[in-house]
Structure formats: structure tokens, C-alpha cells
């Protein structure tokens, strides 16, 4: 086996690629996280999804994660990730997939509605954190861990659950289905 991948390693890579594709990963994520060729990944994607993968650049702005709703979802995802990283072993990509599945369970919405945080954005978030573009900070009111850009790391920090913007309150009045599905009513947030 001089320099060749074993069959078991290749099967493991295909399983990871299949898991990523089923969770909605873009080609750039697949290419970065597996050692399979682009050609094999394209073929696998088409077999699983029935269509070619979407084209275009990956999102590359930390600003998306700072918007109130996206920040809550991204922070929840990252807190789950930190917990799993502390309590379990495995490759970082396997940890990402497991975390994302748990995130989806917590944020179950209508089956036709996309989750706020897609897998590719979750992957990008972890890369931003590794690079130091984004970090985690405790809210000075509730003590919860939230992601912030490094320029906003200064004290004090108040999360958007403790101090929701008016559009968040309007959204909760339109569809009052709970804290994680959309957002809780104002009296629940202040209790």
C-alpha cells in the first residue's frame, strides 16, 4: 500500500461526503474536507441530489453572523459544538456534522422552510473562529455565550435575546411559536 489510500479510508471519505451532501454542503466544503477528487464529488452529489451542485462563491462576511436572528442561531450552534468537542472524540468534520444535526433538531421548523443557519455557513463560522475573525463572549445580562466579531469584544456585551431589536418583537407577534422556531413573546424574554 505504498502511498495508496486503503479501501476503508476511501469508504470513510465517501460516507463523510454523503453526510455533508445530505446536510446541504456546497462543493467547496466537500473539496476542503474530503480527499475525494472533484470529479467523484460531483458524481456523488448528482447521484444523491439528482442535480448538479449550486455554483458561486461561498459567503465570506462575518457581518452575516452578527445580525440578531443569525447571531442567536450561530451562537447556539457554536455552543453545541464546544460541548461536543469537550465530551467526544472525532475528526472536526464529523463533529461539525453531528453538531449541525443537533442544531437542526433544536430548530425544527416547517419541513419546507430552510434553517436560519445552513451547513456551509456553520462551516464558515468555525473557520472564522479558528482564524480569530469571530470569537465568543458572555452576555453581561444572562451570561449566555454568544459569538461576536473581535472588534465588538469590548465590555459590556448584551445579547439580542436580552435586548431584542424591535423587528424581533414584531416577528414574534406575527408567529408566536416558541423561542427557537422564531422567538418568544416579550413577556417570556423578560421573565
From Swiss-Prot:
Binds 1 zinc ion per subunit. One of its GO terms (cellular component) is cytoplasm. Functions in complex with FlhD as a master transcriptional regulator that regulates transcription of several flagellar and non-flagellar operons by binding to their promoter region. Activates expression of class 2 flagellar genes, including fliA, which is a flagellum-specific sigma factor that turns on the class 3 genes. Also regulates genes whose products function in a variety of physiological pathways. Keywords: Activator, Bacterial flagellum biogenesis, Cytoplasm, DNA-binding, Metal-binding, Transcription, Transcription regulation, Zinc. Heterohexamer composed of two FlhC and four FlhD subunits. Each FlhC binds a FlhD dimer, forming a heterotrimer, and a hexamer assembles by dimerization of two heterotrimers. It is found in: Cytoplasm. The gene is flhC. Its cofactor is Zn(2+). Its main location: cytoplasm. The keyword Metal-binding applies. GO terms for biological process: bacterial-type flagellum organization; positive regulation of DNA-templated transcription; regulation of bacterial-type flagellum assembly. This is Flagellar transcriptional regulator FlhC. Zn(2+) binds at residues 139, 142, 159, 162. NCBIfam families: PRK12722.1. One of its GO terms (molecular function) is zinc ion binding. SUPFAM superfamilies: FlhC-like (SSF160930). It holds the Pfam family FlhC. Belongs to the FlhC family. The keyword Transcription regulation applies.
